């Protein structure tokens, strides 16, 4: 979960040879020349090693809504420090909601193999001007049978189970229609 420039994570540690082998299969490198090109070994144009497997448990993450986060983490007027006013409380509650926004919607995709595409990276890789609207990008992918959601990251990020060539083709259609 993003909190400013920090990322909070929760881990469950298990000892197992088979588990270690399964974990090792989820480690890879990302080829910087494509949106998602994963490679099995380090190359001159790759970053890594990186975790390339699912990012969360869908059942748990799908329950992490803005309302639930505010209920669990939020303060009320009685719990506030005495020097706080309603405006400061509202700011804290807004930040709590922002920190989990889009997690529940993206949970099914984050719990499986997926592409995670920052929209500004798409714009750069496609060779066009700016990126298309993330809402239009999600809509066109879903209308073509793919799953898609906005990622729970500060920058507009698309998460999908579509392959890279389908993403490039479909999102470039939006770009052409916007010009």
Name every feature range the model reports, one short phrase each.
Residues 1-179:
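SAM-dependent transferase fold signal centered on methyltransferase-like domains
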């Amino acid at each position: 979960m993003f909190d400013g420039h920090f990322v909070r994570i929760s881990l469950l540690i298990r000892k197992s040879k088979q588990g270690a082998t399964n974990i090792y299969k989820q480690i890879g490198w990302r080829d910087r020349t494509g949106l998602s090109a994963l490679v099995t070994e380090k190359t001159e144009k790759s970053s890594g090693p990186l975790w390339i497997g699912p990012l969360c448990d869908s059942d748990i993450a799908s329950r992490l809504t803005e309302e639930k986060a505010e209920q669990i983490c939020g303060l009320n007027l009685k719990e506030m420090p005495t020097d706080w006013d309603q405006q400061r409380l509202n700011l804290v509650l807004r930040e709590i909601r922002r920190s989990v926004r889009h997690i529940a919607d993206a949970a099914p995709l984050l719990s499986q193999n997926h592409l995670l595409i920052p929209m500004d990276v798409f714009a750069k890789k496609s060779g066009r001007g700016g990126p298309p609207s993330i809402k239009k990008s999600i809509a066109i992918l879903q209308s073509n049978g793919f799953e898609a959601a906005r990622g729970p990251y500060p920058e507009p990020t698309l998460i999908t189970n579509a392959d890279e060539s389908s993403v490039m083709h479909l999102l470039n259609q939006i770009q052409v229609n916007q010009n």
